[in-house]
């Protein structure tokens, strides 16, 4: 069984060595989709939505929201950010996938 939750955060970055306009500092409103997979526990839930919210906030959002991604990642592409998010959350919850939207029409997805 899979359940999911959507989160949002704002951050700035630039892409070192990139030849296009993204070489300059700019910002995005990111949408983060987290999907957890597992069996229902005795309480009838795979994971409590509020518990999932707390884990994502403490593990990801508190560290990335309103930050300059270049101070956290050497090369803050959506792919590198999504990979880091997946790895960090996968230590704490049974992830199925992470999808990171960079704006309204661009995304990267990592699946287990």
PLM features: what roles do these ranges have?
Residues 1-112:
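Charge-rich, low-complexity N-terminal segments
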């Amino acid at each position: 069984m899979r359940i999911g939750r959507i989160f949002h955060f704002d951050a700035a970055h630039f892409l070192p060595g990139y030849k296009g306009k993204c070489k300059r500092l700019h910002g995005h409103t990111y949408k983060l989709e987290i999907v957890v997979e597992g069996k229902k526990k005795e309480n009838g839930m795979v994971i409590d939505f509020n518990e999932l919210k707390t884990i994502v906030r403490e593990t990801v959002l508190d560290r990335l929201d309103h930050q300059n991604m270049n101070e956290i990642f050497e090369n803050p592409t959506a792919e590198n950010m999504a990979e880091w998010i997946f790895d960090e959350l996968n230590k704490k919850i049974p992830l199925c996938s992470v999808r990171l939207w960079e704006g309204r029409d661009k995304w990267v997805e990592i699946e287990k």
